[in-house]
Amino acid sequence: MFKRVVVGVSGGVDSAVTAYMLKQKGFDVRGAFMKNWDLIDESGYCSGEQDWLDAQKLCRQLRIPLEETNFVKDYWLEVFGSFLKDYEKGVTPNPDILCNRHIKFNLFYKYAREKMGADAIATGHYARTNFGPFLEQYDDRAPIRLLAGVDDIKDQTFFLSQISADALRRTMFPIGAMTKAQVKRYAADVGLEAFARKKESMGICFVGKRSFQDFIGEYIETKPGDFVDFDTGKVVGMHKGLHHWTVGQKAKIGGCLQPYFVFQKDVDRNVIFVVSGTDHPLLVTDMVYVENPVWINKPERLSDGVLRCLFRFQHTKPLVHCSLIESSEDGSRMFVKLDEPLRAITPGQYAVFYKDEECFGSARIVKPGPSIVYCQR
């Protein structure tokens, strides 16, 4: 059923091993390099150029055809444009989740299927599905389930939590059952040691080697305003723009006996409210308001309409038990009650929901609920 597989080749070790394993399995493998960003930073550096050269090197070595797919315009509209608008509104977005939803598992998936004749696509993500790493357990009558990768540290289901079930049904994750260390050893064993040695890219792809503060300042107008102590109402410093700061971040304010941390941003007044101390109780809440959920496999609720599941809003943080309750008739708005309070719940980020090893999907965070101190009062 699945003969031709188009691999998203990035120039890194994960997609290199993915392509090699698919070829060893006898698939008709085609490579596709996604060009999503084409600007060079002020130092003249563009990591995408080297990645493209490495992708060509891999496909020559494996003797598979390679095509460059250009999604630069779409990326600007669907990902980067939304990214800037969110920062201008005072919220903190997650461009990696948006890229997977709109580009890799939407436009790229459709391109591979319609233009390259793919029966399925494959990527080097650390994730799994119930259909198996090579879709060997595919069942057109069964629902697709997104499962965590076996490498707890590298698991990428958090970033895949907004993709469509239709695309996921025809996606292979060959390295999802491997750890990063195993992938690198495998690469070295099969003659792909150059890719195993390549430094792993970290952070937001379009920022490159620049500091995020310098980068974002190129696109959003600097508008200075006040840092205000939320407890006292006093101005304690000046900021250079709301977009430079996110909830929970340490505020750089000189001359203070105790460090301040960002609590809230008032866009209309261009004010950042801060609180004293990283463990200030106002930064902690056990309630979260979310909207517009995307369900990969919509879970069943309990008889009282409550879903018991696991929650995280940062992919490196431990999962927390929670109760999920719909707060609108159409299910577009929900309320999350956490079993234990968390610090710095950030508007614009995503609440991702799990049960055991399955990732159900996610919803965008609108705002945190009141702090535990307020509720206790």
Language-model-derived ranges and their functions:
Residues A122-R128, F134-R377:
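AMP-forming adenylation/ATP pyrophosphatase catalytic core
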